[in-house]
Regions:
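Bacterial N-terminal signal peptides that target proteins for export
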Residues: 1-9
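Cystatin/cathelin-like cysteine-protease inhibitor module
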Residues: 24-148
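C-terminal motif of bacterial Sec signal peptides marking the signal peptidase cleavage site
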Residues: 19-22
């Protein structure tokens, strides 16, 4: 009985940390301005397509839609994600699964600085937290993503 109580206490503490760990107030303009975003990337579409080539199951038939950006994007550090900033680009991707069928689009956010992708949210190798950050990032960039 004591083991069950201890397990439930640990489970409750972990769930509480996950649910509240990602919550922070939005960054202020001065916080965002304190970082060097570098020059606005001109070749962002090529950078992103090259990045995705090794990540997607079928990159040749994947549908990649550039929805918003590049715009300066700042993501505060939380217990779940490190600080991320750069030129943000929201992309919606529809890739084929292992059966050769399109699964439906999902959002990704790319952070680009000094001509390189320095971080991403969402995507095939990210977790559910990253997918949530991708939706939030796309929303901030002006391309809200929702699942019908």
């Amino acid at each position: 009985m004591q083991r069950i109580a201890m397990f439930l206490a640990i489970l409750g503490a972990g769930a509480s940390a996950v649910l509240t760990g990602g919550c922070k107030s939005p960054p202020t303009q001065s916080e965002m301005a304190a970082y060097d975003y570098g020059p606005r990337p001109e070749n962002y579409e090529k950078l992103i397509r090259d990045y995705l080539f090794n990540k997607l199951l079928d990159p040749g038939s994947a549908i990649v839609e550039f929805k918003a950006g590049p715009r300066q994007l700042f993501q505060q550090e939380t217990t779940l994600r490190p600080l991320r900033y750069g030129w943000g680009v929201c992309v919606w991707i529809n890739d084929k699964n292992t059966r050769g069928v399109y699964d439906g689009p999902y959002p990704m956010v790319f952070f680009i600085r000094d001509g390189k992708i320095v971080a991403t949210n969402g995507g095939p190798d990210d977790n559910i937290i990253g997918w949530r950050y991708a939706r939030t990032g796309c929303n901030e960039l002006g391309a809200p993503f929702w699942t019908p």
